[in-house]
Amino acid sequence: MNIEELYRTYFDIVYRYIRSVSRDGALAEEVTQETFFKALKKADQFRGDCDVRVWLCQIAKNTLYDHLKKQKKQLSGEEQPETAESHGGEIFEEKLAQRSQAMEIHKVLHGLSEPYKEVFSLRTFGELNFREIGMLFGKSENWARVTYYRARVKIREELEHEDHM
């Protein structure tokens, strides 16, 4: 598979994964582009012992972490600016309610500890199967299933707790 095919086939998956972890569309775009650049440079190092998606998501995760470390050094203790996406047009109540619920889920998700947050994101947004997630972490498929299930339970409990407040 050449780089163009790789890019067309996996761009969306890598982008959605990084977007779900970072919650920043511009950053996700930048990291995804850099991921494919790194993948091109390191294509000869791909051993084929895991799915290409797993390999690309691992590169993307490391690239994101590198980017965040670099950004943290640049900000040197300053509060990181929040990014807000502007949405044009009229938003109907139903869409607003769905978005509000999605934001609540994202808030709870990003409050989870690792590896729950990442496993949930890889499964839900990165569309990786449990075997691939296990390989990414150097763990078993069963570990990935249990971790995902526990993340779902934690998210559900936190959302129910917030509803009762």
Give the positions of each predicted feature.
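DNA-recognition helix of helix-turn-helix
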Residues: R131, M135-H161
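A short, charge-rich alpha-helical start-of-domain segment used by transcription regulators
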Residues: M1-R16
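Hydrophobic-face residues of short alpha-helical interaction/recognition segments
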Residues: V14, I18, L56, A60-L68
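Structural recognition of an alpha-helix C-terminal capping motif at a helix-to-coil junction
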Residues: E30-F37, C50-N62
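C-terminal flanking helix
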Residues: F11, Y15, F36, S113, ...
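A short pre-motif secondary-structure segment
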Residues: V119-R123
